[in-house]
Amino acid sequence: MKALVTGASGGIGQDMARMLSAMGYDLIAVARSRDKLEALKQELNTEVQVLPLDLSREQACFDLYNQVKDQNIDVLINNAGYGMYGRFYDTDLEQELNMLRLNIQAVHILTKLFLRDFKKRNKGYLMNVSSSAAFFAGPLMSSYYASKAYVFRLTEAVYEELRREKSDVSVSVLCPGPVDTLSLIHISEP
């Protein structure tokens, strides 16, 4: 059994990797920090392939898929993401667009590519990590909240498509509340 976890270097992704390893899954751990991924690898008792990639770069998403597509991934945890804090009109536009590329575009690309493989095999499990932020307006974190709403709605729609087809492929979305991680970038204080 093999699972791919994005954002595996810390927080929810790291905990998901630990949990999946404890369940006997070999892992493909993806994040920007090779050092943190290597530390995770040393901690786990199953095989761990470390792939340091910046998934906010569109090509990195395709590179990731092409590197692992022949490994018969059973589980994809789309977890990589971060938030920005500040008034919408004050936050740095390029940093915000980078966040949106990671929180939305990477999730979209990886969901589509791996879901196609899961459908061909009629098995697989995909979890997209959203947030309870998906259900609220989110002043001072407007773009982050909107990005998590996208992840929630996309996953909900894909779930419904698969349910109607009576597919054996499973899709779910995790919407945790606030979590003590380093994924919040303080850009500008109100």
Task: Give short role names for the model-derived ranges.
Residues 23-39:
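Conserved glycine-rich Rossmann-like NAD(P)H-binding loop of the short-chain dehydrogenase/reductase
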Residues 131:
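Residue(s) in the substrate-gating loop at a strand-loop-helix junction
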Residues 9-10:
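Conserved glycine-rich cofactor-binding loop
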Residues 111, 147:
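Active-site helix of classical SDR
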Residues 87-89, 95-100:
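Substrate-binding pocket helix/loop in short-chain dehydrogenase/reductase
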Residues 52-63, 93:
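The beta1-alpha1 cofactor-binding region of Rossmann-like NAD(H)/NADP(H)-dependent oxidoreductases
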Residues 185-190:
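Residue-level detector of conserved catalytic or cofactor/ligand-binding positions
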